[in-house]
């Protein structure tokens, strides 16, 4: 298979784009790096498109690998013909390859294999030929009696031969392909109750929907209901229609005495072998389709959650509401450092409620709280009313927001939280997390397993590897889109930066704690286990506000520093002007040079890269 041509066609791209993307991936470049700093190579494809290409590339390479494994296996059996080889070369899916391989695949003992051991394959071949002049099947079977092998009667011989024919028909790639397509187009998914009791699955106790039209959430609900023992599920197809497909392949003559027996073998093949097998395939395909769609929804939800605008420069108070155990409180400064913690009771007695007001008011006034984050879990509404009344009584400009507390309890009980806050109780760590996720959602949420953030239904039913890869990719893309402050970022945040793994992230923080703040991007080259390739991949996504080189605090990659300085000089500016914010007319001056395209020619730089440099230089410091 020409993988480049296949991807080019599927994604409606040009061959050079796909060739370059594949080359960049094979060279070990990360998707964020390719998307951001190799735009000339691929024509400015975004990170989501690049991830889809990478996933398809992996699938097609695995497909080719399996194709050659099957080819080698059949060749090793000395059964590879030009026709089979061509069919393998033309197979576009794993299912097609497995259909071709099915007759040659080593099998466990079956009724057909036992019949072959009894020497009944020649009888099966004679019957299947359906010659008009052949004898009646039972008469033919008399020549294959063998009491020593358990073939006592003509009926025994005929039954064994028909078992062989049934298995051969069930292994026929053409029959399986046609029936699979028929199930997909005309099949019906049905579910019935397995227990006489009410449950959340009641809507599916007498449910049916076409395979083509059943919704993903319905598939996932039915799957879960079946796993939990509430539902019996099947995929059905009009049987006469299915038998007709088999007959169209099996029927060789309408005048042969053997035809009726062969057609009966075809019906047995469908009922006993083909229908259960294809039903499993269809259900697996439906589940995969539903999971893929659900993962896309989860990814979109997670992206929106991570990219919520942060509330910068304010002391925040986090409230983790609760009834019996009270409402946990934490105050953090503008950098997220914990200033105060406590527990208040606002849903108990009036005396405790008044005490809670007094405690919270003291915290707000002592630390100059500017914003309050309220978790949206149990007792959230009561806590919101209580907070609104308190703010009104204080009479100062304090705002509050209700934030998702999904994953806060998971984080608070994690090893990471214990390392970060060994002095705090688990419940108080949740309040800290709630306050911080208002200040900087991305930096706080990367500490939590994306699956625990609560981004969609049925997420725990998804294929773990696929869900982890998809959500991990979203987190990585979001972190790299925003950029990370090298001198304040936690190991959790740094580990999501392009080119940096968990070990290197810890090394970066350890080096920072031992040697002080990094003075520049280049300084991380001294970090253990961070080599030249890792630096290339991560440098552009790291920010160093303290650096003497203002470009270290932008999204301009170090490899483009000379181009950035040359552009500034061409427009009558310097790096000092960038630092002071005195380059407001940069875009107009670039246009005065004939636009980005003309400037790129003069500087021998790529147009997309130069366009990004202009955009980065104009961002506020």
Model-based region annotation:
Residues 30-31, 42, 46-148, 340, ...:
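Accessory alpha-helical DNA-binding modules that contact the DNA backbone or grooves
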Residues 281-299, 452-485, 583-621:
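Long, charged amphipathic helices and adjacent flexible linkers at domain junctions
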Residues 49-52, 59, 63-318, 322-423, ...:
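Duplex nucleic acid-engaging cores and interfaces of nucleic-acid transaction enzymes
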Residues 1-19, 26:
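Generic start-of-chain signal for non-secretory N-termini
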Residues 18, 341-348, 371, 413-426, ...:
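Short beta-alpha connecting loops at secondary-structure transitions
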Residues 96, 225, 401, 407, ...:
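Long, charge-rich intrinsically disordered scaffolds of nucleic-acid metabolism proteins
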Residues 180-188, 319-323, 377-381, 403-410, ...:
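A glycine-rich phosphate-binding loop feature that marks nucleotide/adenosyl-phosphate handling sites
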